[in-house]
């Protein structure tokens, strides 16, 4: 088996490493650098430049130099409004997909990323002196299925078989913990890179790297800190000269480079001067930009970003079920962790000095190389247990989301559950796949839909449809539905078009907390309405089957109570439905008692509708009713 290289495909910079014996080695590129700018440029003579060569000519060729393409990976055109606005290159809509247009030719984000991956592949081949065809590529822990699939596609375009997609903070933990002998060490990996932020809590011990929880924001990174400085400079210049530099691609690129340089300088200095002569020109002559920026001013400009860092950290700690005092180390990963304010916030939250023993620019690629070594057998006694960041489920009766796989579940994993039809002679069901944390389906993200047909006609509740969710080691989801009677099966692999974007992920979790009370009330109303629907169905069925066996003096009150329940059901109010259900159940209990006495055979009478619909339903619980077209047959069928 050949070498499996490890690639950190970053927003700002990329890095490649490989196992050399028992140790990982970061590989220098042809220019002698250990990291490569994630930039691709197209020159007027048709030449394609990648990495440092692209960065050197970015100012003079701004419209044809592509950077931060990672932020477009696996996302629709209408999901990237902010990215489009700040990019000097042209982003166009091709059938709903975001594409980069260069000289009337369109490139997908996967194609641009593949060009960067090809550079990393060539770097490794030059170092090893042999062809490289396999790689482990890292992604932010909070990348969704579409973004992960897009990354795999980019690897394929680059001529690489992607053996594994692993999360960046997990890769960093592998690199940090490979030679650590301490058992059961709890580590927080704080990964703030060029475009994304991840926080993962892991437990390391005896070669096992177990992720306890992960959280983050796929729209928070060095680019966003740069943008605060860019906007500040542009606004200051507009005040002074009345010209918006953001409308000029070349000026915007100069602002970007100056902002990045200023941010870096402010990590070691308290102030810096930004001097951009001849930034633009008017009829009056050339204009120059000279601004002094202090560290305090920068921290004020980026205060919202700093605030946004803390919330995911607190959620990750809570979800990992650990106390801050139990965390042994906080490992800093990503170039943006060099910002003093970031380090200050980390120290303040975790009550300890952050661990700076790893190279924040290289550690992720090193971890990917170690994972490659695990796959080839070069590295033994290492077990990696990662997690899925968000819950996955399907839409169920009344528009409720029923979770099959909870957030922070260890992957790979598979979960199965058996459902049934909700109507007589129903011959097909729809599986509506969802991702998110809200109780109601409409508040979560649709990943896909598919139908299972040709179900033999039968009374409702009879057919058994097994729905299975399967997340592979790359974090990519596969869903299937199977009619257990006929063996007919339908499946779907979630494609890149229908996935969550970064803002939606963060919004889901924030909304879940902000609207918890409202969600609980809505869910209770739906569950109560579902229970009433089942009770109405059962009552009408019993009335028809028992007919004249029901005493006349009881039948009329029952029918009246049933009518009141139907009216309450129409209102959708749980407060109205519950007493109406209690009234119907009380009358039915009385009727059932009389029927048993008449038959002189206790226990041989016909069960009342309350028993048929289940005590769970009369109390507002509907675990037995789970889809607009499904209900669970038997709790014992779950988790097969």
Swiss-Prot record:
UniProt cross-references to CDD domains, sorted A to Z: ASKHA_NBD_HSP70_DnaK-like (cd10234)
Family matches, as InterPro entries: ATPase_NBD, Chaperone_DnaK, Heat_shock_70_CS, HSP70_C_sf, HSP70_peptide-bd_sf, Hsp_70_fam
Induction: By stress conditions e.g. heat shock.
Keywords linked to the UniProt accession: ATP-binding, Chaperone, Nucleotide-binding, Phosphoprotein, Stress response
Organism domain of life: Bacteria
Presence of the UniProt keyword Amino-acid biosynthesis in the record: no
GO molecular function: ATP binding; ATP-dependent protein folding chaperone; unfolded protein binding
Pfam families: HSP70
Protein's job: Acts as a chaperone.
Homology family: Belongs to the heat shock protein 70 family.
Protein name stated in the entry: Chaperone protein DnaK
């Amino acid at each position: 088996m050949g070498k499996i290289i490890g690639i950190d495909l970053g927003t700002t910079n990329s890095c490649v490493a490989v196992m050399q014996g028992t140790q990982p080695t970061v590989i220098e590129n042809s220019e002698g650098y250990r990291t490569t700018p994630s930039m691709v440029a197209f020159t007027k003579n048709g030449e394609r430049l990648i990495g440092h060569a692209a960065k050197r000519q970015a100012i003079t060729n701004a419209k044809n130099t592509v950077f931060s393409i990672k932020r477009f990976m696996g996302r629709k055109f209408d999901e990237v409004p902010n990215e489009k606005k700040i990019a000097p290159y042209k982003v166009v809509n091709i059938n709903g997909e975001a594409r980069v247009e260069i000289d009337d030719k369109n490139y997908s984000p996967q194609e641009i990323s593949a060009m960067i991956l090809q550079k990393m592949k060539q770097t490794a081949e030059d170092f090893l002196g042999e062809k490289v065809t396999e790689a482990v590529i890292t992604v932010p822990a909070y990348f969704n299925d579409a973004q992960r699939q897009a990354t795999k596609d980019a690897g394929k375009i680059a001529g690489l078989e992607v053996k594994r997609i692993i999360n960046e903070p997990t890769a960093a933990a592998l690199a940090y913990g490979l030679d650590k002998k301490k058992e059961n060490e709890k580590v927080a990996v704080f990964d703030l890179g060029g475009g994304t932020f991840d926080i993962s809590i892991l437990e390391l011990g005896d070669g096992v790297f177990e992720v306890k929880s992960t959280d983050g924001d796929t729209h928070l990174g060095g680019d966003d800190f740069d943008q605060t400085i860019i906007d500040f400079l542009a606004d200051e210049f507009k005040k002074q000269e009345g010209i918006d530099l953001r409308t000029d691609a070349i000026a915007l690129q100069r602002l970007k480079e100056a902002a990045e340089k200023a941010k870096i300088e402010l990590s070691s200095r308290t102030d810096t001067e930004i001097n951009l002569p001849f930034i633009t020109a008017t009829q009056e002559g050339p204009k120059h930009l000279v601004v002094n920026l202090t560290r305090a001013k920068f921290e004020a400009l980026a205060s919202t970003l700093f605030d946004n860092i803390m919330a995911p950290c607190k959620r990750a700690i809570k979800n990992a079920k650990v106390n801050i005092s139990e965390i042994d180390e906080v490992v800093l990963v990503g170039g943006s962790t060099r910002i003093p304010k970031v380090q200050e916030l980390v120290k303040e939250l975790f009550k300890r000095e952050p661990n700076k023993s790893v190279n924040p620019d290289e550690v992720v690629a090193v971890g990917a190389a170690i994972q490659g070594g695990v796959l080839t057998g070069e590295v033994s006694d290492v077990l990696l247990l990662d997690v899925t960041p968000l819950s996955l489920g399907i839409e169920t009766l009344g528009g409720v989301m029923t979770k099959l796989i909870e957030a922070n579940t260890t992957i790979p994993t598979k979960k199965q559950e058996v459902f049934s039809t909700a109507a007589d002679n129903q011959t097909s069901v729809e599986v509506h796949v969802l991702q998110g944390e809200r109780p109601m389906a409409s508040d979560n993200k649709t990943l896909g839909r598919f139908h299972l047909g040709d179900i033999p006609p039968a009374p409702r509740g009879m057919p058994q449809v097994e729905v299975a969710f399967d997340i592979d080691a790359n974090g990519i989801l596969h869903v299937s539905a199977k009619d257990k009677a006929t063996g007919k099966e339908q499946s779907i692999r979630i494609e890149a078009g229908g996935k969550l974007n970064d803002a939606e992920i963060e919004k889901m979790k924030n909304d879940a907390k902000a609207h918890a009370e409202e969600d609980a009330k809505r869910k209770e109303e739906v569950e109560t309405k579902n229970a009433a629907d089942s009770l109405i169905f059962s009552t009408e069925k019993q009335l028809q089957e028992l007919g004249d066996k029901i005493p006349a003096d009881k039948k009329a009150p029952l029918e009246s109570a049933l009518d009141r329940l139907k009216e309450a059901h129409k209102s959708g109010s749980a407060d109205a439905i519950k007493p109406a259900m209690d009234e119907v159940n009380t009358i039915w209990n009385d009727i059932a008692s009389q029927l048993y006495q008449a038959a002189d055979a206790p226990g041989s009478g016909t069960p009342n509708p309350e028993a048929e619909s289940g005590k769970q339903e009369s109390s507002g619980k509907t675990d037995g009713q789970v889809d607009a077209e499904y209900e669970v047959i038997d709790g014992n069928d779950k988790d097969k």
